[in-house]
């Protein structure tokens, strides 16, 4: 089992140039749990994850890992505890799958330490877990988008960190591989106690797989808590500007969001939030 770590953001303000993206945000990540961050496009989700992983320094406030500011922690030392799979990563030209996944072991290498049997085992386990072992000798350049994404996830797993941050890990994946990846993260959490923080666009997947949801709107936390507490019709309207219905997923028992558009509604009238009536058109 991994060591439990506290990861928090305290009054964090982030931005690019003259633009502020996250403003005075406070966040506590439950240790040993799976947290999903959701929100509309450009609300600050990915920016927050970049700051939590030391890639973007706050203008004010701090991101703390076990009470120490991550931006004051040496990069290699931090990488032994906290791993990141960024959005749309780029691989060096011509690198093979095995070599890329092996780079996940670099934080564990030192001036005097050499590649070990444990490193081989960590890479093999990561390849098997992501169903990419058969691709080990192929160039990453040759792979499909879905295959590449699974290889990047394998590299993150090979790093064997106690805290794992993932920015849209199901990007480019078909629905079956989306489920496989999310199941894999749950297995990692349950078997190793890994703290997982992931940005997801699919609200229903987030509610099904996360223990803790964080909904961000306009650079601040709008709501946080259990999926049942956060995924409400009021939150969906406030965060996404979308009318919806929330029902219980009959397979998982978690909240299931049904979006209400202007078309393809049932012929009978459906009450909309605020007492308005909606019909098919």
Which role does the model predict for each range below?
Residues 7, 21-24:
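Conserved structural motif at the start of ABC-family nucleotide-binding domains
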Residues 38-40:
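The feature captures the beta-strand-to-loop junction immediately N-terminal to the Walker
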Residues 53:
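Helix-to-loop junction immediately C-terminal to a conserved catalytic motif
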Residues 61-69, 78:
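Conserved ABC transporter NBD signature motif
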Residues 102, 117-135:
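Conserved ABC ATPase "signature" region
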Residues 114, 139-143, 147:
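Conserved ABC ATPase signature
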Residues 164-168, 173:
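Catalytic Walker B motif of ABC-type/P-loop ATPase nucleotide-binding domains
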């Amino acid at each position: 089992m991994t060591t439990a770590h506290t990861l928090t953001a305290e009054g964090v303000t982030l931005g690019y140039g003259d633009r502020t993206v996250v403003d005075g945000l406070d966040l506590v990540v439950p240790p040993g749990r799976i947290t999903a961050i959701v929100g509309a496009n450009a609300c600050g989700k990915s920016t927050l994850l970049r700051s939590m992983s030391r890639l973007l320094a706050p203008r004010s406030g701090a991101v703390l890992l076990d009470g120490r500011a991550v931006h004051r922690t040496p990069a290699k030392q931090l990488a032994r505890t906290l791993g990141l799979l960024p959005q749309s990563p780029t691989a060096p030209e011509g690198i093979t799958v095995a070599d890329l996944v092996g780079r996940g072991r670099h934080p564990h290498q030192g001036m005097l330490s050499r590649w070990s049997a444990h490193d081989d085992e960590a890479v093999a386990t990561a390849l098997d877990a992501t169903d990419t072992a058969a691709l080990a000798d192929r160039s990453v350049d040759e792979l499909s988008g879905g295959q590449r994404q699974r290889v990047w996830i394998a590299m993150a797993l090979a790093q064997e960190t106690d805290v794992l941050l993932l920015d849209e890990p199901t990007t480019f994946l078909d629905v079956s591989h989306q489920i496989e990846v999310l199941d894999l993260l749950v297995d990692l959490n349950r078997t190793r106690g890994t703290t997982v923080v992931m940005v997801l666009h699919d609200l229903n997947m987030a509610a099904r797989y996360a223990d803790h949801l964080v909904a961000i709107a306009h650079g601040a936390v709008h709501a946080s808590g259990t999926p049942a507490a956060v995924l409400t019709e009021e939150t969906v309207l406030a965060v996404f500007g979308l009318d919806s219905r929330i029902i219980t997923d009959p397979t998982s028992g978690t909240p299931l969001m049904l979006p209400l558009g202007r078309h393809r509604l049932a012929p009978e009238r459906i009450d909309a939030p605020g007492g308005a009536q909606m019909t098919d058109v």
